[in-house]
């Protein structure tokens, strides 16, 4: 019963990276992750998130912002959170992408947020304006 009463949040890559990346640290993200870790809230995301994180780590390695071993450590840290991932309705994602003139990647998070009636946590200002 307790699981169903937890406030649910959809998280995207910008939100996760602001928590994981040493030079992008955000107090807001850290507070939310602490609440998640102590089981006060629930995080959910799309199956796409992990690919976005790995792509960001790869880009950051190429720019010498992090080392490959640091990327592996951050990936392990994220996976240790065991955040539930959902597949999305691709036709609805396409519709939202066209409606808001955003990528299908971004619209997948918006779709999940609407579908699961969960607040969307992002640091992408364009996406914040759509979901408010």
Roles of regions detected by a PLM:
Residues 54-81, 90:
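Active-site-proximal, substrate-binding regions of enzyme catalytic domains
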Residues 81-126:
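Active-site neighborhoods of divalent-metal-dependent phosphate/nucleic-acid chemistry enzymes
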């Amino acid at each position: 019963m307790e699981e169903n009463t937890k406030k649910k949040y959809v998280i995207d890559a910008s939100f996760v990276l602001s928590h994981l990346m040493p030079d992008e640290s955000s107090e807001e993200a850290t507070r939310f992750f602490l609440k998640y870790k102590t089981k006060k809230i629930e995080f959910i995301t799309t199956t796409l998130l992990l690919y976005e994180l790995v792509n960001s780590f790869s880009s950051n390695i190429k720019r010498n912002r992090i080392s490959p071993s640091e990327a592996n450590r951050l990936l392990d840290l994220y996976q240790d959170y065991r955040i539930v991932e959902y597949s999305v309705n691709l036709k609805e994602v396409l519709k939202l992408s066209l409606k808001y003139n955003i990528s299908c990647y971004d619209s997948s998070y918006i779709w999940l947020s609407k579908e699961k009636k969960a607040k969307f946590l992002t640091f992408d200002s364009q996406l914040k304006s759509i979901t408010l």
